[in-house]
Regions:
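Conserved donor sugar-nucleotide recognition element shared by glycan-biosynthetic enzymes
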Residues: 10, 33-37, 81
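Class I SAM-dependent methyltransferase Rossmann-like catalytic core
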Residues: 18-31
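Conserved alpha-helix/loop element of class I SAM-dependent methyltransferases that forms part
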Residues: 31-47, 64
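Residues lining the SAM
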Residues: 119-120
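Class I SAM-dependent methyltransferase SAM/SAH-binding core
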Residues: 52-105
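A short acidic, Gly/Pro-enriched loop at the edge of an enzyme's catalytic core
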Residues: 104-116
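N-terminal, positively charged/glycine-rich alpha-helical extensions of SAM-dependent methyltransferases
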Residues: 1-20
Length: 120
């Protein structure tokens, strides 16, 4: 189930692109990454929601959600790469909770979150 034994290879590739992560996101979306995030979140995430940003990277989806809903969101960033999570707090007025792991083993109780978001 999931990536299993391939996780180490995937993590190696992701570590390599950390310095250019945001540029890659912009490039592969033809510069429409923020627009696509907004369209995906609009009307789906509401003020005071507890959200899990799964595979959060630098928290781009959560940053967009915060712009749309204000700072009343309770955000948890979840990513397998600790280096991606390390510098995220500086991007948020209210620092999000941070957790590291893979999707196959999400360590949260059922119904802890009002919404789970996942994007690039």
């Amino acid at each position: 189930m999931g990536l299993g034994g391939y996780w180490s290879e995937v993590l190696d590739v992701l570590r390599d692109i950390i310095p250019v992560y945001d540029k890659v996101n912009s490039f592969i979306s033809l510069g429409k990454d923020e627009e696509f995030r907004t369209r995906g979140l609009l009307g789906r995430v509401k003020e005071e929601n507890a959200i899990l940003d799964a595979g959060s990277g630098f928290g781009n989806m959560s940053k967009t959600a915060s712009k749309l809903c204000g700072n009343d969101l309770k955000i948890t960033l979840y990513d397998p790469l600790i280096p991606m999570l390390k510098n995220t707090k500086k991007f948020f007025e209210i620092p999000p909770a941070l957790a590291s792991g893979v999707f196959e083993h999400i360590p949260f109780q059922d119904e802890k979150f009002d919404a789970v978001i996942c994007g690039y």
